[in-house]
């Protein structure tokens, strides 16, 4: 069963961290963060990451649940996420910036690391509902 280690973008931003720093997850693990802000999820085969987070009782951001907005956007830092058809992200955002939508995304590796709540990034702001 794939495991997704996650970190809330708001925590990264509030602490002035660089989410692309190799040790950003180490820094998060050294803090006393709520489970919703940092931790790991096991995601069942065919389950979307957002669904797995909700099954744990987490209130991660979303709106459309159909890949038509950027509310549930996450940045993949390790591993990969396979998305169903999405209509909102550019090829550059998917291929170069590693943006994925957790509402239609499932892990495509045994271990994945993401920064969720990435809707706050400047280049995604105009697609948040």
From Swiss-Prot:
Read off the PROSITE patterns from this record.
2FE2S_FER_1, 2FE2S_FER_2
Q: What does this protein do?
A: Ferredoxins are iron-sulfur proteins that transfer electrons in a wide variety of metabolic reactions.
Cofactor binding, per record: Binds 1 [2Fe-2S] cluster.
Kindly list the cofactors needed.
[2Fe-2S] cluster
Binding, [2Fe-2S] cluster: 64, 69, 72, 103
Whether Transport counts among this entry's keywords is yes
Signal peptide feature range: none
| SUPFAM superfamilies associated with the record | 2Fe-2S ferredoxin-like
By what name is this protein known? Ferredoxin-1
Matching InterPro entries: 2Fe-2S_ferredoxin-like_sf (IPR036010), 2Fe-2S_ferredoxin-type (IPR001041), 2Fe2S_fd_BS (IPR006058), 2Fe2S_Ferredoxin (IPR053441), Beta-grasp_dom_sf (IPR012675)
Molecular function in Gene Ontology: 2 iron, 2 sulfur cluster binding; metal ion binding
**Positions of the 2Fe-2S ferredoxin-type domain:** 29-120
Keywords for this protein:
2Fe-2S, Electron transport, Iron, Iron-sulfur, Metal-binding, Transport
Q: Which family does it belong to?
A: Belongs to the 2Fe2S plant-type ferredoxin family.
Question: Which Gene3D superfamilies would you find in this protein's record?
Answer: 3.10.20.30
